[in-house]
């Protein structure tokens, strides 16, 4: 059976959790391959809203094993707060497994994240301050602490001693902050060791053996394509690769075992934090999309920036990830609009760009070229086929499919798991 990847095709918050949850009852493993608790997603089950950060959306599917992959950076305190919160509401998290090779976020990573953002001033990236970037820096710099290290306190201590020699120099001499003690960091991590130990696995072997048994593995990328450290709007990006290729690296599942790559896009566009956003709306319409769509960050509560659908970005995302399918979410948010603009090209200094400009400077100065589509007023939350939609809504969906260059296989028409039009099976087809 296949390995399937779900990827955000914009700047995050597209509804990946809903897509994962929709498929979760039919898959055997749900994997989070990258990111940390800097990106949250919301899943609505039976009218009840669950806000997840570190845990894969599949944690709410009792028949699927949830796996936090090697590409994730884990704040253990945040992890167990999330687990305890779900269990207090009756959820079963006993099917969670964690890669031994995933890295751990230390208290000094969070401090460094926060003080470095303040140090950058106007050049700040707009991080969540949760230590994700500094943890990835230590991973690449070979100063990182991995999940498996809590199984051996002596190794953990050696690694922390090495890391703090550098971190304390930065904190004290550059940022005028206090130094961290080795003992306090060792005690912090060892305080989670007993709860972590039963969950720790060789996730590469676990997932590949599942595929050998013809079981279905679903990988849910965090963040999104345009937050990818290589392919995103650099430097306003995350510190990992939340594209389809990153799912392979962050899970240990080889690329030839991946048969479906599903891109998730809103029927409009949102972004959190700093960075270019050609179709951004600063007027009452932007506020309408924000309010109607509930566009506030799961982690921070920050209001999201809102704008129209960008077909140029959609085509580029399809290329980068090799999308086989698109899942359009929140079509219902557009209900009631008399006209819906879609960005079909850019103009930069009088020159038209039908595809993404090569440089970030040009993208930063891009002015959208719009094509307008007629809206609809009918309630679409009960639609379960494209034919159930008003004609103008059908035309809008077909236009997005044509402009993105990728088939649309599902459309979200409301907040609940069941508020979805499935055009074609996302597993069997």
UniProtKB/Swiss-Prot annotation:
It is found in: Cytoplasm. Its EC number is 6.3.4.4. The active site is at 13 (proton acceptor), 41 (proton donor). Disulfide bonds: none annotated. InterPro entries: Adenylosuccin_syn_GTP-bd (IPR018220), Adenylosuccin_syn_Lys_AS (IPR033128), Adenylosuccinate_synth_dom1 (IPR042109), Adenylosuccinate_synth_dom2 (IPR042110), Adenylosuccinate_synth_dom3 (IPR042111), Adenylosuccinate_synthetase (IPR001114), P-loop_NTPase (IPR027417). Its cofactor is Mg(2+). Substrate binds at residues 298-304. GO terms for biological process: 'de novo' AMP biosynthetic process; IMP metabolic process. Pathway: Purine metabolism; AMP biosynthesis via de novo pathway; AMP from IMP: step 1/2. GTP binds at residues 12-18, 40-42, 304, 330-332, 412-414. Belongs to the adenylosuccinate synthetase family. Homodimer. This is Adenylosuccinate synthetase. It comes from Kocuria rhizophila (strain ATCC 9341 / DSM 348 / NBRC 103217 / DC2201). The gene is purA.
């Amino acid at each position: 059976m296949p390995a399937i990847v779900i990827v955000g095709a914009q700047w995050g918050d597209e509804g990946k959790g809903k897509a994962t949850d929709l498929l979760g009852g039919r898959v055997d493993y749900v994997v989070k391959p990258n990111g940390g608790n800097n990106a949250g997603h919301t899943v609505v089950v039976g009218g009840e809203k669950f806000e997840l950060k570190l845990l894969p959306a599949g944690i709410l599917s009792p028949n699927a094993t949830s796996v936090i992959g090697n590409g994730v950076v884990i704040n253990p305190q945040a992890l167990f707060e999330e687990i305890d919160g779900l269990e207090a509401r009756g959820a079963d998290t006993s099917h969670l497994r964690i890669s031994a090779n995933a890295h751990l976020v230390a208290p000094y990573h969070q401090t460094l994240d926060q003080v470095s953002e303040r140090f950058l001033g106007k050049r700040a990236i707009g991080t969540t301050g949760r230590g994700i970037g500094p943890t990835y820096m230590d991973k690449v710099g070979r100063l990182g602490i991995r999940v498996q290290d809590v199984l051996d306190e002596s190794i953990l201590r050696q690694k922390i001693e090495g890391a703090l020699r550098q971190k304390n120099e930065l904190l004290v001499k550059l940022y005028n902050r206090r130094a961290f003690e080795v003992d306090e960091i060792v005690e912090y991590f060892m305080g989670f060791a007993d709860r972590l130990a039963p969950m720790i696995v060789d996730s590469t072997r676990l997932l590949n053996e599942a595929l050998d048994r013809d079981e279905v593995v679903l990988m849910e990328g965090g963040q999104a394509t345009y937050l990818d450290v290589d392919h995103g709007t650099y430097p306003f990006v995350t510190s990992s690769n939340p594209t389809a290729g990153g799912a392979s690296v962050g899970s240990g599942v080889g690329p030839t075992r991946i048969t479906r790559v599903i891109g998730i896009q809103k029927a409009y566009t949102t972004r959190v934090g700093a960075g270019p956003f050609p179709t951004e709306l600063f007027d009452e319409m932007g506020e309408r999309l924000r309010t109607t769509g509930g566009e506030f960050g799961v982690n921070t509560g920050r209001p999201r920036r809102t704008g129209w659908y960008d077909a140029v970005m959609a085509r580029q995302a399809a290329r980068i990830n090799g999308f086989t399918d698109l899942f359009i979410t929140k079509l219902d948010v557009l209900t009631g609009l008399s006209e819906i603009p879609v960005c079909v090209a850019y103009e930069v200094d009088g020159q038209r760009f039908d595809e993404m400009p090569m440089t970030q400077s040009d993208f930063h100065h891009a002015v959208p070229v719009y094509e307008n589509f007629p809206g609809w007023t009918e309630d679409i939350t009960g639609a379960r086929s494209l034919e159930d939609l008003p004609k103008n809504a059908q035309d809008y969906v077909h236009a997005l499919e044509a402009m993105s260059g990728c088939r649309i296989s599902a459309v979200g028409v409301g907040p609940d798991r069941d508020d979805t039009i499935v055009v074609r099976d996302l597993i069997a087809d």
